[in-house]
């Protein structure tokens, strides 16, 4: 039966190599710091790909037994402009906390968007959320993002450069942003659409 090492022994193994000279121990510690720094830089590069935009910040209240409890609600859109985008909502007692929660919620609800070579969408799509309807159409190169409000923010952070969007129904920023997300989630490439329908690309275009 082998003896289990104590916490002090494990810590000493992690900090210093047994039997090593002070010069070797210093070199090992330097290498560990380099590895940690390299890992931190990779995480920073990964985080720098994402952009965050606050669509709306509102002060909301909740009636409780002792009176009204005030807090802030933030609607945040996150995306990497490479075909991934998400919408999140956060509530907290301060604005910074609400935005931070909104960013975290948005990264949990990401949607992957198929992009064409000219940074448009492959097909027309209609998304609905509550009383909001959003219609998005592909556009020719040089058209730009023809949309407004929270819909424009969602499309831009998804990496779409040429698109036509129309808001139908409700003007609520949250419902419109979520309706745009539904429309983007329904998009399919021509190849995947033909595969789902069991027909060839020639039959799809005919």
Swiss-Prot record:
<dbReference type="GO" id="GO:0015935">
    <property type="term" value="C:small ribosomal subunit"/>
</dbReference>
<dbReference type="InterPro" id="IPR000851">
    <property type="entry name" value="Ribosomal_uS5"/>
</dbReference>
<keyword id="KW-0689">Ribosomal protein</keyword>
<dbReference type="InterPro" id="IPR005324">
    <property type="entry name" value="Ribosomal_uS5_C"/>
</dbReference>
<keyword id="KW-0687">Ribonucleoprotein</keyword>
<dbReference type="Pfam" id="PF00333">
    <property type="entry name" value="Ribosomal_S5"/>
</dbReference>
<dbReference type="InterPro" id="IPR014721">
    <property type="entry name" value="Ribsml_uS5_D2-typ_fold_subgr"/>
</dbReference>
<dbReference type="InterPro" id="IPR005712">
    <property type="entry name" value="Ribosomal_uS5_bac-type"/>
</dbReference>
<dbReference type="GO" id="GO:0019843">
    <property type="term" value="F:rRNA binding"/>
</dbReference>
<comment type="function">
    <text>With S4 and S12 plays an important role in translational accuracy.</text>
</comment>
<keyword id="KW-0699">rRNA-binding</keyword>
<keyword id="KW-0694">RNA-binding</keyword>
<dbReference type="InterPro" id="IPR020568">
    <property type="entry name" value="Ribosomal_Su5_D2-typ_SF"/>
</dbReference>
<feature type="domain" description="S5 DRBM">
    <location>
        <begin position="50"/>
        <end position="113"/>
    </location>
</feature>
<comment type="subunit">
    <text>Part of the 30S ribosomal subunit. Contacts proteins S4 and S8.</text>
</comment>
<protein>
    <recommendedName>
        <fullName>Small ribosomal subunit protein uS5</fullName>
    </recommendedName>
</protein>
<feature type="compositionally biased region" description="Polar residues">
    <location>
        <begin position="1"/>
        <end position="15"/>
    </location>
</feature>
<dbReference type="Pfam" id="PF03719">
    <property type="entry name" value="Ribosomal_S5_C"/>
</dbReference>
<dbReference type="GO" id="GO:0006412">
    <property type="term" value="P:translation"/>
</dbReference>
<feature type="compositionally biased region" description="Basic and acidic residues">
    <location>
        <begin position="38"/>
        <end position="50"/>
    </location>
</feature>
<dbReference type="InterPro" id="IPR018192">
    <property type="entry name" value="Ribosomal_uS5_N_CS"/>
</dbReference>
<dbReference type="GO" id="GO:0003735">
    <property type="term" value="F:structural constituent of ribosome"/>
</dbReference>
<comment type="function">
    <text>Located at the back of the 30S subunit body where it stabilizes the conformation of the head with respect to the body.</text>
</comment>
<feature type="region of interest" description="Disordered">
    <location>
        <begin position="1"/>
        <end position="50"/>
    </location>
</feature>
<comment type="similarity">
    <text>Belongs to the universal ribosomal protein uS5 family.</text>
</comment>
<dbReference type="InterPro" id="IPR013810">
    <property type="entry name" value="Ribosomal_uS5_N"/>
</dbReference>
């Amino acid at each position: 039966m082998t003896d289990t090492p104590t916490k002090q022994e494990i810590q000493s193994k992690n900090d210093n190599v047994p039997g090593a000279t002070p010069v070797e121990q210093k070199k090992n510690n330097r290498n560990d710091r380099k590895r940690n720094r390299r890992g931190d830089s990779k995480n920073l590069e990964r985080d720098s790909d994402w952009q965050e935009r606050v669509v709306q910040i509102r002060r909301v209240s909740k009636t409780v037994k002792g009176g009204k409890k005030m807090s802030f609600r933030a609607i945040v859109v996150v995306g990497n402009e490479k075909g991934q985008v998400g919408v999140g909502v956060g509530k907290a007692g301060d604005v910074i906390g609400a935005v931070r929660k909104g960013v975290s919620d948005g990264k949990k609800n990401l949607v992957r968007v198929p992009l064409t070579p000219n940074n448009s969408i492959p097909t027309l799509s209609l998304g609905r959320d509550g009383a909001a309807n959003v219609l998005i159409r592909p556009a020719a190169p040089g058209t730009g993002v023809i949309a407004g409000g929270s819909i424009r923010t969602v499309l831009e952070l998804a990496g779409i450069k040429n698109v036509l969007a129309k808001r139908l129904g409700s003007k609520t920023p949250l419902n419109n942003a979520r309706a745009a997300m539904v429309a983007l989630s329904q998009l399919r490439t021509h190849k995947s659409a033909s595969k789902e329908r069991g027909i060839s690309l020639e039959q799809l275009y005919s």
